[in-house]
Amino acid sequence: MEFKTYSDFFDKNANSIINWFEGELAKVRSGRANLKILDNVRAEYYGEQTPLIEMASLSIPEPREILIKPYEKSSVNLIQAALLKANLNLTPVVDGDKIRIKLPLLTEENRKENVKKVKAVGEKAKQEVRFIRRDTLNKIKSDKIADKDLNKYFEEQVDKITKKYIDQIDSILAKKEKDLLSL
């Protein structure tokens, strides 16, 4: 029996958790413009709820500004309405055929609240990694490895991999916290 089967299972699942975690952190405002905060915004477009990325080009001309240039001028007001409806605490300003969003400076209170949010998301990600650890250990047990030493070795390796992913989450979290707390 090879450990690679178990490590591949663990890595595949843990990497998807890391990707989810990074995506969630990108949505939390840090005072700098980030297009990820618009990922869930959808506007009515030809009768369908359409993601902004499919209706307009999105860019960051300045560190605290997002520029939205709709592909069709007629959709400017639809996009503005969708941004207001999305409840992101942003003020979209129509500037001719484009929309500008100036990101306000975050207050100390907002920053601390955002740190709490990212810590909660970090805990959720760690919990998911621990669930993967449990599932991997259950797979090892269900395969009924006769050699007790090999079984123990596999469990130790799973613990090492778990620690690696938990440390990776902690590192990403620390970087985001630093970003949130810096002015």
Curated annotation (Swiss-Prot):
Classification via InterPro entries: Ribosome_recyc_fac, Ribosome_recyc_fac_dom, RRF_sf
One Pfam assignment: RRF
Protein name: Ribosome-recycling factor
Keyword Protein biosynthesis set for record: yes
Function of the molecule: Responsible for the release of ribosomes from messenger RNA at the termination of protein biosynthesis. May increase the efficiency of translation by recycling ribosomes from one round of translation to another.
Main localization (coarse): cytoplasm
Source taxon at top rank: Bacteria
Keyword list, A-Z: Cytoplasm, Protein biosynthesis
HAMAP family: RRF (MF_00040)
Protein localization: Cytoplasm
One GO CC annotation: cytoplasm
Record bears the keyword Cytoplasm: yes
SUPFAM superfamilies: Ribosome recycling factor, RRF
One GO-annotated biological process of the protein: translational termination
Similarity comment text for this entry: Belongs to the RRF family.
GO molecular function: ribosomal large subunit binding
